[in-house]
Amino acid sequence: MTAQYYQLDEKFNQQTYEQYGKGLALNDLYIRRGASGSLVFNQDQQISGIFFAVASHSDPKPGEKTLVQLLRLPVDESTTATVKDNCVPYDLIFGNRNTTHYYTQFAKQHHTHLYEQIQQSNDQLIKFIDRKNVSCSMVS
């Protein structure tokens, strides 16, 4: 299995849709249609993304891509030079210092269940949303 970064511009019913954020296009994964929403784990068994599409209109065949929406893309000292040159730290849920709109901002404003969980958590990786100066520190 190989992975690559992609930008998705898809036409469906005469409308063009763009994929925002960071994602992966995985070759030879053979996840079938209907599996959208399935979790994708990294080598450390941490959730890294959510499977959302097959890049064809039928079940995947050898060499075809399945698409994953990344939840986080850390850029730190362990990140390869190729990724560092093309990416900034990214976090779909918590944002980063350059993000103006992100999910936990909405959760805080509307006092959602997720925000209650954040407030009750002792995990500093998710508590940083309460700090005034949101940092870019993220885990892989």
From Swiss-Prot:
<dbReference type="GO" id="GO:0003724">
    <property type="term" value="F:RNA helicase activity"/>
</dbReference>
<protein>
    <recommendedName>
        <fullName>Uncharacterized protein MPN_580</fullName>
    </recommendedName>
</protein>
<comment type="similarity">
    <text>Belongs to the MG067/MG068/MG395 family.</text>
</comment>
<dbReference type="InterPro" id="IPR022381">
    <property type="entry name" value="Uncharacterised_MG067"/>
</dbReference>
<dbReference type="Pfam" id="PF00949">
    <property type="entry name" value="Peptidase_S7"/>
</dbReference>
<dbReference type="GO" id="GO:0005524">
    <property type="term" value="F:ATP binding"/>
</dbReference>
<dbReference type="InterPro" id="IPR001850">
    <property type="entry name" value="Flavi_NS3_S7"/>
</dbReference>
<dbReference type="GO" id="GO:0003723">
    <property type="term" value="F:RNA binding"/>
</dbReference>
